[in-house]
């Protein structure tokens, strides 16, 4: 586009209307491009006071401005000579411009807003300062596109920016676009290597013009499963033609096609170390803790759901949601909040261009927003997206080994549970077996078996299981999988059964012994009672006989016939004759012998009487015979009595 034509357009626009004034300060160049495309509604001068120093550009775009370069064919970039310097224009009076409302010059394809304001103001600077103004950044350093630093691309890019782009704007836009594409590719690589490769293919297709912006937008969202912010499509429409023109110019200098040049110099476009990439959370909508998409609050504040793919709906209201307001309390105090109608962080990380509203380091933002973008990753571990294929293979190998270890543990646990279940069934069968044996032993003891057979049968009961226990425990060979507690419990159960059987045996033996002792004691008591009864009966019979003899005073004590004589010693015993007296003397002398000493003491007594008879009877026992004179003298002493036993004692005994 010739410089004279640009001057004519600027003059005609300035004479048509005085809609707003533009300042020449550098913060205007920053704020114009860094505003969100979703907040690109046409605005007039701000009400309620003067606008901030770094927020001023609010005019519409000029016809045929560099912002509309996308309407030109991509294959034939315009080649124009550098415009001559305009010495007649002064820098003290800011020119005024009217919005572009005439459709005869061609439709304006970008929404009216800060994109056009920045580009138009850059064109004003170009018209006022001439072509001698070199593309510099705000701090005075030369502003060249990031990523192209060697070879003929550097000089060609610098010349392209000097000849066809606004000063301090075109190079910065190219740098922002490259950082944007680099951030997309790194975000895809953070998710997975496959998604990163797909995103890289989409980016190369977009730059090579094989994909339209809408197709790139839809396929990118389909590949990453994350919605992009509404400003992405207007940003690409505004800046992608600049990158394609630069690529075409560099390809012509290298005598190659754009596709060949991009294939050979792909690292210049997607070089992560050449520029600081944009935080992916600024390009993507936020997600909640469950990893699902969350509709932004700004799309539902007015009660209507708007499609993020249509920025014209979002341009009807100012954007008030700032990422600085989304910081959680755990991330520290938020940064100072810019005015609500600016979205300085929506397009790029341009913190080195701003002095009043400085943002944190991109690494800090990446670490803060990474749990929102990739919910599956750990917050304390930052994924290195510069891993090589070998490192990724190592990571996958480690993950595969981990999964194999987990599977082995699960398999071993399952086998252990199976073995434990089998052992539990075997223990249950064994306990049932012991219970049956114990019940059989109880039934046997309750039966009508004799007392002597009961200990024998009960003793044979526990001894049999004791011999069977080793045979029942021998078949178990899976001791490696059975814990010691199982065996210990089984042994305790067997020992408990043994102890109960032994206690029952001891109880049965003690009962038998007690009953035997009781039986012996009972028999002994019976014998003693029988003997005592016999003795008592004999003594009673003897006493009865004695009593009968004592009561019968007229019968002989020896033969029971009628007595005719009386013993001279006791005067109680009655005999029928001397023969019976001598026959009964063996028994009678025990009674009568005590009174024999009495007659011996009174032998000298001349008085005839019973002592004399006793004296005559007493000496007759030891001597064996009595004199007839003594017997004769004793006879008349007891008149009326039978003949004395003296003559009877003469009979040899």
From Swiss-Prot:
It comes from Homo sapiens (Human). Residues 1-430 are annotated as: Mediates interaction with PDE7A (in isoform 2). It is linked to A chromosomal aberration involving CBFA2T3 is found in therapy-related myeloid malignancies. Translocation t(16;21)(q24;q22) that forms a RUNX1-CBFA2T3 fusion protein. The modification Phosphoserine is found at residues 457, 459, 637, 641. The modification Phosphothreonine is found at residues 479, 650. A zinc finger (MYND-type) spans 556-592. GO terms for biological process: DNA-templated transcription; granulocyte differentiation; negative regulation of cell population proliferation; negative regulation of DNA-templated transcription; negative regulation of glycolytic process; positive regulation of proteasomal ubiquitin-dependent protein catabolic process; regulation of aerobic respiration; response to hypoxia. One of its GO terms (cellular component) is nucleus. Residues 176-268 are annotated as: Interaction with HIF1A. Residues 485-533 are annotated as: Nervy homology region 3 (NHR3). GO terms for molecular function: transcription corepressor activity; zinc ion binding. Gene3D superfamilies: 6.10.140.2220, 6.10.250.230, TAFH/NHR1 domain. The keyword Thylakoid does not apply. Pfam families: NHR2, TAFH, zf-MYND. It comes from the Eukaryota. Homooligomer. Homotetramerization is mediated by nervy homology region 2 (NRH2). Can interact with RUNX1T1 and CBFA2T2; heterotetramerization between members of the CBFA2T family is proposed. Component of a TAL-1 complex composed at least of CBFA2T3, LDB1, TAL1 and TCF3. Interacts with ERBB4, HDAC1, HDAC2, HDAC3, HDAC6, HDAC8, NCOR1, NCOR2, and ZNF652. According to PubMed:12242670, may not interact with HDAC6. Interacts with PLXNA1, PLXNA3 and PRKAR1A. Isoform 2 interacts with PRKAR2A, PDE7A and probably PDE4A. Interacts with ZBTB4, ZBTB38 and ZBTB33. Interacts with HIF1A and EGLN1. Residues 11-23, 447-462, 622-638 have a biased composition (Low complexity). Changing residue 518 to K: In a colorectal cancer sample; somatic mutation. Residues 1-127 are annotated as: Required for nucleolar targeting (in isoform 1). Widely expressed with higher expression in heart, pancreas, skeletal muscle, spleen, thymus and peripheral blood leukocytes. Expressed in hematopoietic cells (at protein level). This is Protein CBFA2T3. The record marks 127-128 as: Breakpoint for translocation to form type-2 RUNX1-CBFA2T3 fusion protein.
